Structure formats: structure tokens, C-alpha cells
Swiss-Prot record:
It comes from Streptococcus uberis (strain ATCC BAA-854 / 0140J). Catalyzes the reversible formation of acyl-phosphate (acyl-PO(4)) from acyl-[acyl-carrier-protein] (acyl-ACP). This enzyme utilizes acyl-ACP as fatty acyl donor, but not acyl-CoA. Pathway: Lipid metabolism; phospholipid metabolism. This is Phosphate acyltransferase. It is found in: Cytoplasm. Gene3D superfamilies: Isopropylmalate Dehydrogenase.
Amino acid sequence: MKKIAIDAMGGDNAPQAIIEGVNRALASFKDIEIQLYGDQEKIKHYLESEERVTIIHTDEKIDSDDEPAKAIRRKKNASMVLAAKAVKEGQADAVLSAGNTGALLAAGLFVVGRIKGVDRPGLMSTLPTTNQKGFDMLDLGANAENTASHLHQYAILGSFYAKNVRGIAKPRVGLLNNGTEETKGDPLRKETYALLSQDPNIHFIGNVEARDLMSGVADVVVADGFTGNAVLKSIEGTALSIMKQLKSSIKGGGFKAKLGALLLKESLSDMKHSLDYSGAGGAVLFGLKAPVVKSHGSSDANSIYYTIKQVRTMLETNVVGQLSEAFSKETISND
């Protein structure tokens, strides 16, 4: 039985969206147990059944405007902190939260802990592509500054995840740069390019540009945390803007526009699906001793369900255990 610790009070729509997502996951997956950390009365209001559910009551939670490191130290009984401690103490196998991103990163690093040999765990998410296959990108903001060695390690981590969780036999790894030529980029990108080119364990395809990411140019895209976070926000904003503009044009275009939308309903639905990243789950702080997964702060029940599904797959494939073993045996170089 896979035990997942969930911060029931984290996120804009907590606890309702969290618990409704849990209800659906419990109905779909009979091999999971859920530990819910938060206000017991509020949790029970939305919970359909307590079968395979344990509620750990706490009145304390970490707010979105709390300073991450201080919040982890001072709010020791916060729902997020208790969920992370459950993983550290072996009471749960993974932790999930839609709360304060910085605080979850801090809890992951300082409570759950890094895999030995991993210098900087990276925040990774599966983002949408027009071919609906998606691509994994890291770092998405766990670290503002990185070295070439860190980016090399992100390529290793991303490849490992793509193989073991997403089932891609030979993941194509691209380095995000301002051009595809080998000579492009600043010293960080050039040094990283050299490291990735020399690693036989990585299927490195070279530099990739931001404009090509959503066309599926690579299965894994490596970037420093600052750049990765900027690209993530750009992709999210672009997808939202496209859908908003389409709705506005249809509503304001009169009868012909509405008729056209009706005729193109299936195609528009496919396009919306291709731009929707919620079905891929949350962002993984990859490189820790257990799965620590961040769902979007505005997640609805559907997003929470898919994030639980993602965590279940990570546990089912034992991707963290395999990664830890690989690093401990030094079969993967992180020099």
C-alpha cells in the first residue's frame, strides 16, 4: 500500500479542491492510503469516506506570504511541515502540497533531505506540447543560480524521470539556449554543452530555443532556475491568453462566430487539451530521498487528482529508490 501525506490546507482552493481530488483518487486507486494534515472539521466536511484515510489535525498552516525558511522553522506544527516529517520518519512514502512553493522546497531540503551525491535538487514539471506528449523541464526555480555541474546533473535527473516514470526509452535532452549552434550562449551554457556532449548516459541533442519547446523538440529540457521559471510563467501566460482571446472572439463575433465555434467544437477541445498541463500532475522537487510534489496554487480537484496519480506512478516505479541506488553506486557521474 502506497502512503501519501497531503497538506490539506495548502493552495488557493484548500481544503475543498484538495479533498475532492483525494475522493476521486481513492475511488480510482485501491493501492493508496492518504494521510491528510490540516483542520479536521473542514476536511471531514468534504471527505466522502474515511476508508484508507488518516486525518492528522492541526490548526497551523503556512500562508502564501510567509518567508519559506522561517516558516518551516517557526511553524513546526503546520500542515505542510507535519506532512514532510511523516515522510522523513517513514510514516509516509511521499508528500504533496499546493501551498507555498518556497516553503515546500525548504521542507523538502531540510526535512526530507537530499539523495547523497545530488548537489542541487531541481524543480521539474511536465509541460504541454502540440503533439500532446509533453516535455520535462528543470530547474523551474528551486535555485536562482546554477553551475554547469548542476545543469549536467539536471540532465541526468530529467532523463531518469522521463525513462522510469513517463516510459520514454531514450529521452532526448536539450539545453535551453539563445540559439541552436554549439557556439551559442554565455560561459555557463557553453560549459554545460561540453559536459552534456561528453556524457554517454545522456541522449543529448544539443541546444534548443524557447520558441521550439511546445513543438516537442526535446523530451527533457535543462535550464538554470531563473531562466526556467521565466519560461514556465511565459508558457502558462501564453496558454491562458490564447484561450481567453478565443472565448472573447467567439462571444463578440456574432452568430457566424458562434456557429463556427460549434462546428469546430471538437478541434477547439483538442487545442485546449494540448495547452492544458494539469493532466501531467505537479512539479517534482527531484533529487530528494522521497517524492516531494508541488501542485499549482490554484489547483482544482482535477489537478489534485492527477498529481496524486503522478505520485502513485513515482512510487510504483520506485524512481527515487532507483535514482538513489544509481548515485550510491556511482554509476552516474556528477563531477
